[in-house]
Amino acid sequence: AEIDRPVSLSGLTEGEAREFHGVFMTSFMVFIAVAIVAHILAWMWRPWIPGPEGYA
């Protein structure tokens, strides 16, 4: 059995954890970029903070 291998809380090896972290961070950054673009487009369409004249 693999008794000599250090076991982490997640059960992943160091390499597996690093690989998962890389994929996770890349996916997260893509998600954040899409969210930022969506917010910019929504703001251009209908701003949600009124100007001095209110929602005119």
UniProtKB/Swiss-Prot annotation:
One Gene Ontology cellular component annotation held by this UniProt entry: plasma membrane
Subunit structure: The core complex is formed by different alpha and beta chains, binding bacteriochlorophyll molecules, and arranged most probably in tetrameric structures disposed around the reaction center. The non-pigmented gamma chains may constitute additional components.
Reported function: Antenna complexes are light-harvesting systems, which transfer the excitation energy to the reaction centers.
Native species: Afifella marina
Topology feature Cytoplasmic, residues: 1-22
Periplasmic side, ranges: 46-56
Family the UniProt entry places it in: Belongs to the antenna complex beta subunit family.
Keywords, in A-Z order: Antenna complex, Bacteriochlorophyll, Cell inner membrane, Cell membrane, Chlorophyll, Chromophore, Light-harvesting polypeptide, Magnesium, Membrane, Metal-binding, Transmembrane, Transmembrane helix
Domain of life: Bacteria
One GO term of the biological process aspect: photosynthesis, light reaction
Any one Gene Ontology molecular-function term assigned to this protein's record: metal ion binding
Topology with respect to the bilayer: Single-pass type II membrane protein
Compartments in which it is found: Cell inner membrane
Residues the record lists as binding a bacteriochlorophyll: H21, H39
Protein name (database record): Light-harvesting protein B-880 beta chain
Pfam family, one: LHC
TM helices/strands, residue ranges: 23-45
